[in-house]
Amino acid sequence: MIQKNKRIAIVILNYNGLNLLKKFLPSVVNFSDEKISSIYVIDNCSTDNSIPYIKRKFSNVKVICHKKNLGYSSGYNKGLKLIKSDYYILLNSDVEVSKGWLGPLFKLMESDKNIAACQPKILSYKNKTKFEYAGAAGGFVDMLGYPFCRGRIFDTIEEDRGQYDNKTQIFWASGCCLMIRSKIFHNCKGFDNSFFAHMEEIDLCW
């Protein structure tokens, strides 16, 4: 059954991530504007009591359960068909969001219909003065086809000194925290299911 939603569906894919949910889901619940967003967890047939925990602790978080582990791409593709919303934010289960995180993303997408997808600046959880390897400040592809990010090239991670606070066009937005228009996601037929995990967001944005 398709679930009616608010303007934004914040969607977390989970597989046996109980410890991560305990650590990071509270920030998503506490700092996401309920007026414009709903929170979903798509579960890939977890066996670690993830779902009972969510239902017990977060009654406002909606849960979609798969009958087997479909991986990242197929897990999202199948689950998102059941969620009706203008925008999806695909959020990794190990991401801590901060107060006010949602507003700038929503404002940007609303301001320009030509923007298909976007991401925020993503900082390391363990060292918040540095960028996170997965996505940093936006993704690009070099002339040989290798992906890199503003703030991270190969294993070199930059310190965040505000050098990438400006809005700019990027080649790909990180699946760590990817906001995309739902219509575009479905028109592109979602992620390529041949990507079980990793690199699928680059393929989608391409």
Question: What are the residue ranges of the model-derived segments?
Answer:
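Short beta-strand/loop segment that forms part of the nucleotide-sugar
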Residues: 36-45, 64-66
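Conserved donor NDP-sugar-binding/catalytic core segment of glycosyltransferases
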Residues: 96-146
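A conserved acidic beta->alpha catalytic loop
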Residues: 18, 27, 43-51, 68
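Short, flexible, basic/aromatic active-site loop/helix in glycosyltransferases
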Residues: 138-170
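Short, acidic, metal-binding catalytic loop of nucleotide-sugar glycosyltransferases
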Residues: 26-36
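A short, conserved alpha-helix in the catalytic core of glycosyltransferases
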Residues: 171-206
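Glycine-rich, basic loop-to-helix element that forms the pyrophosphate-binding segment
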Residues: 65-83, 93
